[in-house]
């Protein structure tokens, strides 16, 4: 393969008129074949266009497409520009800068990476009874801790939704439509049981024999940093502590 690519690079410096017709045809076929590997990713329908003024973003974090990997329909694709429409729970793919995204069929998406983080489709991995949408893997050990960010477009007057769009997101009080951010958490135990998580005690109670040690460890950390942990921080820290023992 390396020799083939080197030959193609050398030939590319020659005028087309000096290349045999057969060589030109072979080169075109070679590049078509190389590009065809990811063509299936771009066959979906166009991403939904939100033709309104709104605060916040419908995306998982921001509107930037980031390069990642995706396992789609049983095949792994590398270095693909991806983003997530969190309002519709759709994985978007783009094949060129300036072009709108295409939607990947969720039933064929097993997992993907975005911004260095791993995301999974629980229904593709565990069946239709699992929670729908995409979930970010916050801790990947014997017990997994996952997070789902969802967005909902809501009416917004007098700045009442300002604190519900996420940190560092621009806000204009003259706009009366806002994408409100919501976050859900769950754990998947070593036995494969999926448990929704709404409180710190739910995580701690997963390990009844170690609750006292967990409490002491967390108190020591919170004293050191002089603040209480968020639910997300707490879940990751508890699982790290338990699995390190």
Locate the predicted segments by residue:
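Aromatic-patch recognition
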Residues: 61, 66-198
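Positively charged n-region of N-terminal signal peptides that target proteins for export
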Residues: 1-5
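Exposed alpha-helical structural elements
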Residues: 18, 26-30, 107-108, 202, ...
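Bacterial N-terminal signal peptides
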Residues: 7-17
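General N-terminal leader/first-domain-start detector
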Residues: 20-81
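Generic low-polarity alpha-helical segments
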Residues: 15-22, 42, 55, 145, ...
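Long, compositionally biased interface segments
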Residues: 195-245
């Amino acid at each position: 393969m390396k020799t083939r690519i080197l030959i193609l690079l050398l030939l590319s410096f020659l005028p087309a008129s000096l290349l045999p017709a057969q060589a030109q045809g072979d080169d075109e076929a070679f590049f078509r074949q190389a590009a065809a590997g990811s063509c299936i990713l771009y066959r979906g329908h166009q991403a939904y266009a939100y033709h309104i003024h709104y605060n916040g973003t419908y995306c998982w974090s921001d509107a930037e497409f980031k390069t990642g990997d995706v396992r789609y329909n049983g095949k792994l694709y590398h270095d693909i520009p991806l983003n997530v429409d969190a309002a519709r729970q759709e994985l978007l793919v783009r094949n060129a800068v300036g072009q709108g995204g295409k939607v990947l069929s969720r039933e064929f998406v097993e997992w993907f990476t975005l911004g260095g983080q791993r995301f999974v489709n629980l229904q593709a991995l565990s069946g239709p009874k699992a929670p729908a949408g995409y979930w970010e893997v916050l801790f990947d050990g014997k017990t997994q801790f996952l997070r789902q960010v969802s967005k909902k477009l809501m009416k917004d007057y007098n700045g009442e939704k300002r604190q519900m769009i996420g940190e560092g997101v621009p806000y204009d009080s003259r706009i009366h439509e806002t994408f409100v951010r919501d976050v859900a958490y769950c754990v998947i135990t070593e036995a494969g049981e999926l448990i929704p998580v709404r409180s710190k005690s739910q995580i701690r109670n997963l390990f009844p024999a170690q609750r006292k040690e967990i409490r002491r460890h967390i108190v020591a950390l919170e004293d050191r940093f002089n603040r209480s942990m968020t639910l997300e921080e707490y879940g990751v820290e508890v699982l790290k502590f338990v699995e390190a023992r």
